[in-house]
Amino acid sequence: MSGMFITVEGPDGSGKSTQLQLLVENLKQKGYDIVVTREPGGTTVGNQIREVLLSPDHHEMTPRVEMMLYAASRAQNVEQVIRPALERGAIVLCDRFIDASIAYQGYGLQYDLDQIRSLNEWATNGLTPDLTFLFDLNPERASARMKDRGQLDRIESRDQAFHERVYAGFQTLLKQYPERIVRIDADQSIECIQDEVLDYTIERLQQGGVQK
């Protein structure tokens, strides 16, 4: 595959989705072939799974089922969207990927990390991002931002202890994969973050020889 696979991660409320859209716009203006997707979602099948996963009506969902639904959405996204785009040389920008499952289901719900990794290895046929931006925002600030947004989904509405475990999970991943995961201070202004993310992305694209 000759494209580049870039993911954004971070706690709910970190601003990662806003920054992803800004990065998409900036790269398109520079002439790059961009495909943008998200998880859960990104496909018709994935979007239906997303509705089930995030609906507050499904409070009885078990950690095992939650993990398997995320992996199912991810498998469809990889086969239908991500891998074909990479094979044609596009840059794929994805809002969350396997790191999110490790942080949210593994650390947040305290589900077995080895099982999560094994399931997702199979679901994606071993696909790993080339670059991941982790938007780092402490749980208290993230919680305040989420409350300002209004109604919360099933995941966002979990207690503060859950979100603190998720945050700790992301910090662990940052230490485990320093060559892939780049920490972004999400408490800066939108403009400062935008510039930092774009500069780093362009540098990595040039290093990787990705063509416009």
UniProtKB/Swiss-Prot annotation:
Its lineage opens with: Bacteria, Bacillati, Bacillota, Bacilli, Bacillales
PANTHER family named among the record's database cross-references: THYMIDYLATE KINASE, UMP-CMP KINASE 2, MITOCHONDRIAL
Q: Which organism is it from?
A: Exiguobacterium sp. (strain ATCC BAA-1283 / AT1b)
Q: What class of enzyme is it?
A: transferase
Q: Which GO terms describe its cellular component?
A: cytosol
Tell me the protein family, please: Belongs to the thymidylate kinase family.
GO MF terms listed in the record are: ATP binding; dTMP kinase activity
- Which keywords, in A-to-Z order, does the entry hold? ATP-binding, Kinase, Nucleotide biosynthesis, Nucleotide-binding, Transferase
Q: Name the SUPFAM superfamilies for this protein.
A: P-loop containing nucleoside triphosphate hydrolases
Signal peptide start-end: none
Described by its record, this protein's role is as follows: Phosphorylation of dTMP to form dTDP in both de novo and salvage pathways of dTTP synthesis.
What this protein is called in its record is: Thymidylate kinase
- Gene3D superfamilies linked to this entry: P-loop containing nucleotide triphosphate hydrolases (3.40.50.300)
Is the keyword Nucleotide-binding in the record?
Answer: yes
Any one Gene Ontology BP term: dUDP biosynthetic process
Name the chemical reaction catalysed here. dTMP + ATP = dTDP + ADP
Residues annotated for ATP binding in this entry = 10-17
Q: HAMAP family annotated for this entry?
A: Thymidylate_kinase
EC number(s) from the headed UniProt entry:
2.7.4.9
